[in-house]
Amino acid sequence: MASASSSRAGVALPFEKSQLTLKVVSAKPKVHNRQPRINSYVEVAVDGLPSETKKTGKRIGSSELLWNEIIVLNVTAQSHLDLKVWSCHTLRNELLGTASVNLSNVLKNNGGKMENTQLTLNLQTENKGSVVSGGELTIFLDGPTVDLGSVPNGSAVTDGSQPPSRESSGTAIAPETRHQPPSTNCFGGRSRTHRHSGGSARTATAASEQSPGARNRHRQPVKNSSSSGLANGTVNEEPTPASEPEESSVVGVTSLPAAALSVSSNPNTTSLPAQSTPAEGEEASTSGTQQLPAAAQAPDALPAGWEQRELPNGRVYYVDHNTKTTTWERPLPPGWEKRTDPRGRFYYVDHNTRTTTWQRPTAEYVRNYEQWQSQRNQLQGAMQHFSQRFLYQSSSASTDHDPLGPLPPGWEKRQDNGRVYYVNHNTRTTQWEDPRTQGMIQEPALPPGWEMKYTSEGVRYFVDHNTRTTTFKDPRPGFESGTKQGSPGAYDRSFRWKYHQFRFLCHSNALPSHVKISVSRQTLFEDSFQQIMNMKPYDLRRRLYIIMRGEEGLDYGGIAREWFFLLSHEVLNPMYCLFEYAGKNNYCLQINPASSINPDHLTYFRFIGRFIAMALYHGKFIDTGFTLPFYKRMLNKRPTLKDLESIDPEFYNSIVWIKENNLEECGLELFFIQDMEILGKVTTHELKEGGENIRVTEENKEEYIMLLTDWRFTRGVEEQTKAFLDGFNEVAPLEWLRYFDEKELELMLCGMQEIDMSDWQKNAIYRHYTKSSKQIQWFWQVVKEMDNEKRIRLLQFVTGTCRLPVGGFAELIGSNGPQKFCIDRVGKETWLPRSHTCFNRLDLPPYKSYEQLKEKLLYAIEETEGFGQE
């Protein structure tokens, strides 16, 4: 009988995966009480493998959805395809229906061929606990031709892979055998434990296959048509015990030849090789057998608990007695581990050397690596001395002859083009000034009790031992502004210094190229969420290039500013239940404890954390800010009782009353517990362990107030805050904000909203106009007559955002750095004013009258939307 592994030309090999081309044509879902037009896609999974799960693009339709999209999959003839039709919504995806395809049934129904086979699948969905019809899905399958003779048909298996059975005197075969070797499938004779390209290993066997490895200590007779010449030979050896698997191993995973497998005509005779292999030059005590090859005579030892076995067709597999599993692949050397990366690719971890590799390690590979490592260690010391042969003498000489002594820790002196400069490895910055003399030459002494110190980053500060306080401000007269030092002095200069330090960190960690984000104004939230979360966090540090679908604007910074403004207004909208207003009269935002009503709320908080970090990293403003206690949480600072007054005045007044009154005289029975209600569910929280049994007294009242204040700021929002900070930290490390306080962080994120008209006029420039032009005078007259809301709309119309930098209009940022507000004479009097948000420029036509200019300007800022190109 032909072996199952035989193949013909044009027929898929039975033991290899093949490519299947699946064309998703259309779907007719049954839509009940939903929107008439739905946005959906199809997800296809092969055998439930994440690496073989692919999706189609999104399509919008009503009664019928058309894709006509081709997906290429790696399958076997016994694979199962799971197809799911999803409907996309803003906050979640909804399953419209599922269907499954058994490829073995399709092959049998079509004579082993799949040539543009059309299938109309019935979608099923769940409705109130019952499975109902969800419509139809039409697909085409185009795959290889398969020999149906190699496909297991239930109870029968091919002769070439007939498994042995246990002896009648042995233990009965259980449904799950002790050692189940890899099984055969219709693409031929391999179990799902062998490696697939881009996939993961599976140990499940088909229901129609029996275990050829269900042997414990007694081996069974095996018939093999390919070994008929050895039918009269017998092996008079003892069976191999399970505790000695290393004596029957072979090198690698290469199958033994037919001569290594002796078959007896006696059913009770052991037929597989046992305890040991013949030594070199020694003949085995069998009749009709041949000597084993050299590779099998000098085997590498298997790990403890492993055993090598052989199928009747000569194929070798390995039994792990520790986990009671089998595999085709030889076990890894000690200290190695097999893992899968997010793309489904296998790699191998060497815990001995803490390294990884794509190549599967073998005994020879490990020996070669150890030999190379030994040679490398011998040469490493010599190479290190060789590379530092000049550095040691020069450094010692410079130290000996330098009157200022050694540099501070973390500093290095270098020379470029004849000029000396200094490198601060603590902050990864360079400077021309010598840190040993900077700020010390010709400076008066500090006042009594004061001391100058430096942080680990090289920033100096001053310690007042009289009051036990520290400050960045120089206490010496004439040094308040820090003009001689360059370090932060007074508060206004201190914030500028902190801001420039932060911008320096952002620029020094920026990545080249740009990242494109394509969104639609109608689905801004969903589009931005999908694209930002699908990107690597470090890619979000690249220069942003925002594309508004249907608009032809080129983003040189202006579209990005508007995108940050619009998206922040959308994601921080309390209607999504992710955030809530801090109070009735306080429109700052805080995390909503009831956000868990959305099952994916933690993913959205992670997205918002990334978005806020992007705004700070790229120097853009958002529309609405958070509460000051939330900024303190970002800075890892502890909120105080005074911070509670702005977000919950009633709770604050209650705590103040407790603090100012004697609880024992009032007869209040308070304990270290507090109740909280979320979505109608009341839960009790202990402020400290065993708090329900600890009564609040005058002695422990301060501790109670402190714990109660901390609980009020964190109640019900611990998970949400952690997800937000994790997302933020992925883009910009929170350590970069350590110099700021909560008010400075709010100012840097939200900017200033109050508009100073004199500052605006003072820092405006004109093109093809002059300051005395009548159109310019009319323009400023219109702006002065506007209220603050319309002025903000005008500012947003021209710059893309309604917020101002800390320095006001003098520090407006354009595409290439600072760019002031500009008014240009462009167009005819019938045109509307236009803006170039990337350059902070307003195109103002030469209108004939004040009324005409006012009408056109107000119409432009209130009724226009979108970008275009001239």
From Swiss-Prot:
Q: Which organism does this record belong to?
A: Mus musculus (Mouse)
Reaction catalyzed: S-ubiquitinyl-[E2 ubiquitin-conjugating enzyme]-L-cysteine + [acceptor protein]-L-lysine = [E2 ubiquitin-conjugating enzyme]-L-cysteine + N(6)-ubiquitinyl-[acceptor protein]-L-lysine
Region Disordered: start and end of each range?
150-300
Active site, per annotation = 838 (glycyl thioester intermediate)
> What molecular function does GO assign, one term?
potassium channel inhibitor activity
**What's the protein here called?**
NEDD4-like E3 ubiquitin-protein ligase WWP2
Which residues are in the HECT domain? Answer: 536-870
Q: Compositional bias (Polar residues) at which positions? A: 152-171, 222-235, 262-289
Q: Where is the signal peptide?
A: none
GO CC, sorted alphabetically, is: cytoplasm; extracellular region; nucleus
Q: How does it assemble?
A: Interacts with SCNN1A, SCNN1B, SCNN1G, WBP1, WBP2 and ATN1. Interacts with ERBB4, NDFIP1 and NDFIP2. Interacts with ARRDC4. Interacts with POU5F1, RBP1, EGR2 and SLC11A2. Interacts (via WW domains) with ARRDC1 (via PPxY motifs); ubiquitinates ARRDC1. Interacts (via WW domains) with ARRDC2 and ARRDC3.
